[in-house]
Amino acid sequence: MIASFYAFLDYLKNMKAASPHTLRNYSIDLSSLKCFLEKKGELTPTPPLSLQEDSRSSSQLSFSLFTKENIRLYLLEQIQTTHSKRTVRRRLSAIKSFAKFCVKNQWIPENPAEMIRGPRLPKELPSPLTYEQVLALMSAPDLDKVTGFRDRCLLELFYSSGLRISEITALNRSDIDFQSNLLRICGKGKKERIVPMTKVAVQWLQAYLDHPDRAAVEQDHQACFLNRFGKRLSTRSIDRKFQQYLLKTGLSGTITPHTIRHTIATHWLERGMDLKTIQLLLGHTSLETTTIYTHVSMKLKKQIHDEAHPHNLED
């Protein structure tokens, strides 16, 4: 069975063009399942699944343990060990995709996870930042350092073009058209789209790329954004710096780089941009995904209405 895990990860990488972030999540989720099944079958534990071909281990794990009952027990254990409902749902989704792949390859007769439902999540709308909060966040990086210059540029691009964090890290210098103020973005499934940049974002991007301290450490000559060692910046590094800036500005709540993507989409809608254009800019495959911002916009309008209405101001 261990070989099927690796075949699935290779399939995601080579055939589905999954991002490194997605591959890492699948590897973590399936490693967790593997560990549970090994324990259930009283087998010798093996290392987590590796994305590196030269460090992959073998196991005596059999498909006979990959049953509906064991999957249910695994999910129950996940819930009881304080994993969030969102994480458990993600892991179930990974298991279903893996099982479907195994059925397609005729390794198992049917998908044991097909009819299993994950824990329900409360319906949550993304909470966008205000324009003032966006400005506060952008002012947080220390511009005396090239890394601060880089981070200001990152924040400008997040808000300018509504990019995903994986799209930012994958950005190459050759993807930038300074004459037209456009970016060529490689999105999910390696689907390309062209997005515009604001003049402010262009100025910060040009200034960062021309920064002498950036040139002094540059090792990856293709990557747009570099870490302090001159190599391509990772999504983890961006997440870590982002959390530091949230603390510095005093912003609270569940705020991530993806929040800025939600924020600019909401701001575009509130300023009259049509949903189809927002869909194209964000790289959504389905317009249905984009319509969530109409609910966010209405929620904000209702909040403003309730706070400003004279009847609500009475004692």
Curated annotation (Swiss-Prot):
Domain Core-binding (CB): 1-103
Compartments in which it is found: Cytoplasm
GO biological process terms, semicolon-separated: cell division; chromosome segregation; DNA transposition
UniProt key word Cytoplasm: yes
Location, primary (coarse class): cytoplasm
Superkingdom: Bacteria
Domain Tyr recombinase: 124-306
Active site feature: R164, K188, H258, R261, H284, Y293 (o-(3'-phospho-dna)-tyrosine intermediate)
PROSITE patterns referenced in this protein's UniProt entry, alphabetically: CB (PS51900), TYR_RECOMBINASE (PS51898)
Cellular component annotations (GO), alphabetically ordered: cytoplasm
Quaternary state and interactors: Forms a cyclic heterotetrameric complex composed of two molecules of XerC and two molecules of XerD.
Family: Belongs to the 'phage' integrase family. XerC subfamily.
Record protein name field: Tyrosine recombinase XerC
Species in which this protein is naturally found: Chlamydia muridarum (strain MoPn / Nigg)
Gene: xerC
